[in-house]
Amino acid sequence: MGDADFVRETIQSLNSHAAELGSMYREVMASVKNRTEIPNVKDIFKEMAEASRECDEMLEIYYGDEDPLTPDVRRAIQRVQDQLSNCASAFVAYMAIARLTLG
């Protein structure tokens, strides 16, 4: 596999993680709004861990390399990081609502 193929597959994989996390974020926020349980919490945490790990692997591959991350790869990593942050914020909102509801 050439460098261009590797970059293309990396971007596609990162974009897939970002899309999946975006969908999961909406699910958690729907649970916040409706004050219902999060239906697939283990799957969400698993996806968050996998996405984070893939970003870490990309940074390790390119760290100190003479060819730095391409702008497209950087943007794909940023999309994943944004969605990870969104999911974490949604869980904070969920826990805040749960505390108010139970208390």
Go through the PLM ranges and name each one.
Residues 2-103:
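Long, low-complexity or tandemly repetitive, helically biased scaffold regions used
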